[in-house]
Amino acid sequence: MARSQASTSTAKGAGFTLHTERLGPLPLINHFIERLGLHDTLSRHVASDARCAVSHASALGVLLRSIIVEREPIYRQQETVHGFADGMFGIGERDMALLSDDRLGRALDRLFDADRTALLTELVLSVGQRFGVRFDEFHNDSTT
């Protein structure tokens, strides 16, 4: 349910207000993203400067969650984020207002320029350590 469509109703005589927000699968997705330490890893490998209103790591986190949940084009990310409860996409209400396709594009440019090999290696090792995945017979075929 979109934020603009969120229902608010008052129970008869009780004085209670019911406020409904859309969560979808994001609490579960956020659990695994946090357990992986993905935001910290992205922050280390895809650095933002002080001029960025929304860090590149946060913008990339929004895109990742969007791909998993909604698969909307980049130009519709702000609408997608506003359709869910505050914080579900890893950014607060203030940052949601600052999200734009230009800002997301700059984050993707920085990701392209980053040392993606080191980033992916750190993420794979993080999965192994935090989820108990054994790599005894793991072969990374990077030729394809």
Specify the residue positions occupied by each region the protein language model found.
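Dynamic "connector" segments at or just before major functional cores
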Residues: 1-144
